[in-house]
From Swiss-Prot:
Domain of life: Eukaryota
Pfam families (UniProt xref): EIF3I
Listed name of the protein: Eukaryotic translation initiation factor 3 subunit I
The gene coding this protein: TIF34
InterPro entries, sorted: eIF3i (IPR027525), WD40/YVTN_repeat-like_dom_sf (IPR015943), WD40_repeat_dom_sf (IPR036322), WD40_rpt (IPR001680)
Annotated organism of origin: Eremothecium gossypii (strain ATCC 10895 / CBS 109.51 / FGSC 9923 / NRRL Y-1056) (Yeast)
Length: 346
């Protein structure tokens, strides 16, 4: 896979997101401008300008009508994708570490940082939409506020499950927690990692999710039972991971801490995207093209490409080639052959 390099950020990347159709990529970084790109050729479509601090997170709704960003300037902003204008801005008590539209598009989740004697929280804002999915109203107050639970470290990342039924959060002490998506009631807390949870990304149907951690492990977890389905062990701290559609793979990225990068070579730093088989839990390949840690990895909903954002300030866009789709273990080839035999017998 030969990558397309997207150059539009002056500082490190913080998040990369595809829209539902997979034709646009939204990126945010530690500079104060977010970017929108064509996923086919990497051409920049436009920028979202209006923040006064680092943009820690970005998301786009299911209809690609609106994008949302969370920033270190104590604000959450909603943008009109068609022209890059600001539709609304909510002020927050502390910097915003993660934002995400609910699957239904009527709520926005934001993770607030634990600074200035504030313990941190997950807050939910609600919006009103018409029949054409246009937002007609923004509620100024909070729809829900989930404070840091007693006995837990602050939340770093959070995401919605299917239909917005649950909010799943990852904590600084390695725990994960599950909350009622409407009331904010804490439903379950689980000790999962030995170090902070760096990312949570759901499957396409949002029934299970992948956690990554700086303890070099990633876990596949069922959202209903909260049971660990699979565990992936790597040789470096992880910053992000995603679940691929079409193929039964997960992609993991990370590397040595950015502050230690100058003391080692790129090869020793493990600045790679690692491909693991989702079911067999074994590594099947690596892509090494960043000059620093991989901060975020996202795969297109169609499963035909993935994008990675790095500490080096670049986004690498990879379109999967034929060998990716053709790859199968012997047991998978045998199963496919048996299916053909069974079909022929009928």
């Amino acid at each position: 896979m030969r990558p397309i390099m997207l150059m539009g950020h002056e500082r490190s990347l913080t998040q990369v997101k595809y829209n539902r159709e997979g034709d646009l990529i939204f990126t945010s970084g530690k500079d104060n401008v977010a970017s929108v790109w064509y996923a086919m050729n990497g051409e920049r479509l436009g920028t979202l300008e209006g923040h006064n601090g680092s943009i820690w997170s970005i998301d786009v709704d299911q209809h690609t009508e609106y994008a949302v960003t969370g920033s270190a300037d104590f604000s959450v902003k909603v943008w009109r994708v068609r022209d890059g204008s600001i539709a609304h801005s909510w002020d927050t008590r502390t910097p915003v570490r993660r934002v995400e539209f609910s699957p239904t598009g009527d709520r926005v989740l934001a993770v607030l940082d634990n600074v200035m004697n504030y313990a941190g929280a997950i807050v939910v804002f609600s919006v009103t939409r018409d029949a054409n999915n246009q937002i007609t109203g923004f509620n100024s107050g909070l729809s829900c506020e989930i404070l840091t639970q007693e006995g837990c470290a602050p939340v770093l990342v959070a995401s919605w499950s299917y239909d917005g039924k649950y909010i799943v959060a990852g904590h600084q002490d390695g725990k994960i927690s599950k909350y009622n998506g409407v009331t904010g009631e804490c439903l379950e807390i689980k000790d999962l990692h030995k170090q902070r949870v760096s990312d949570i990304q759901f499957s396409l149907d949002r029934t299970y999710f992948l956690t990554t951690s700086r303890d070099s492990y990633a876990n596949l977890v069922d959202v209903e039972t909260f049971e660990v389905l699979k565990t992936y062990e790597t040789d470096c701290p992880l910053n992000s991971g995603c679940i691929t559609p079409l193929k039964e793979f997960v992609i993991l990225g990370g590397g040595q801490d950015a502050r230690d990068v100058t003391t080692t070579s790129a090869r020793e730093g493990k600045f790679e995207a690692k491909f693991y088989h989702k079911l067999f839990q074994v590594e099947i390949g690596r892509v090494d093209d960043h000059f620093g840690p991989v901060n975020y990895i996202a795969v297109s909903p169609q499963g035909t490409s993935y994008a990675s954002g790095g500490e080096d300030g670049f986004v690498r866009l990879h379109h999967f080639d034929k060998s990716y789709f053709d790859f199968k273990f012997d047991v998978e080839k045998s199963a496919d052959a048996q299916k053909k035999v069974d079909t022929a017998d009928r």
